[in-house]
Each structure stands twice: as C-alpha cells, then as structure tokens.
Amino acid sequence: MRTFWIVALLLVGVEGNLLQFNKMIKMMTKKNAFPFYTSYGCYCGWGGRGRPKDATDRCCFVHDCCYEKLTNCSPKTDIYSYSWKRGVIICGKGTPCEKQICECDRAAAVCFRENLPTYKKRYMFYLDFLCTDPSEKC
C-alpha cells in the first residue's frame, strides 16, 4: 500500500520537499529515491511499523522521528533552500520549519550514504505485513 501512495504522488508531480529530498539522496548515494528508498524495509516510504530491518531502514526510522518532532510544519510539502558544496549538503536560510525539515532530510541522506555498503536488495519493496516486531519509540 505504501508503494502505491508514493508512486501516485510521483505521478501527480509533487513539488517541494519530496523532490528536494530525492535530489539530496541522489547527490549523496548516486541512487534515486525511487526505487531504492521509497519502499525499503519497514520504515522507508509512507508510514512505518515494527523494528527497522537494518542500518538503512534505521535511517528512515530516525528520519520519521525527526519529522514527528516538527510542530506546525508540513515536512512533505514545505520547500526549503540548500546548497551542495564539495560533497556536503548545506541547509540555507528560511523559516524555522524550513531549516528543521532541511536538517532532517540532510541527516537522512548522509545516513543513506554512510550505510551504502550494507544496503540489501532483499529489503527493496518490502511488504508491510512482514514488519511484525514491536515498534520502537522515537
């Protein structure tokens, strides 16, 4: 189900944060968010439950927690500014929400890069019903 919603959003041309996050992921990992991270493990993509399957999935769990901590923000649609210098993502000026959303996305993209060596193709398009372990708290 999670994959359906992500593909639907991509097809209608979502502007803003989701596309910015995809660009950050591409810059850091040389992989597109879809298909590599949009439905990986139990937490990458829409929603999440259970225990993260590996370090990459934990990046998504932490990213979800980061978004949860934002109050009165729209992390999936707010547009923020950032730049890319010598392999480093630098979040730019903006509202407090925009800065925090950018930092959440930057941290996740860096986490994905750091965990590329342990990325497992078997967790791509992982089915939600397989995420049966008790969920962790943020």
Swiss-Prot record:
Subcellular location: Secreted
Expression by tissue: Expressed by the venom gland.
One GO MF term: phospholipid binding
Modulation of this protein's activity: Heparin and wedelolactone inhibit the myotoxic activity. The PLA2 inhibitor, para-bromophenacyl bromide (BPB), inhibits enzymatic and myotoxic activities.
Catalytic residues in the record: 63, 105
EC number in record: 3.1.1.4
Keyword Plastid: no
Cofactor note: Binds 1 Ca(2+) ion.
Protein's job: Snake venom phospholipase A2 (PLA2) that is myotoxic and displays moderate edema-inducing activity in rat paws. Does not show neurotoxic activity. PLA2 catalyzes the calcium-dependent hydrolysis of the 2-acyl groups in 3-sn-phosphoglycerides.
Note: Negative results: does not show neurotoxic activities.
The name this protein goes by in its record: Basic phospholipase A2 Cvv-N6
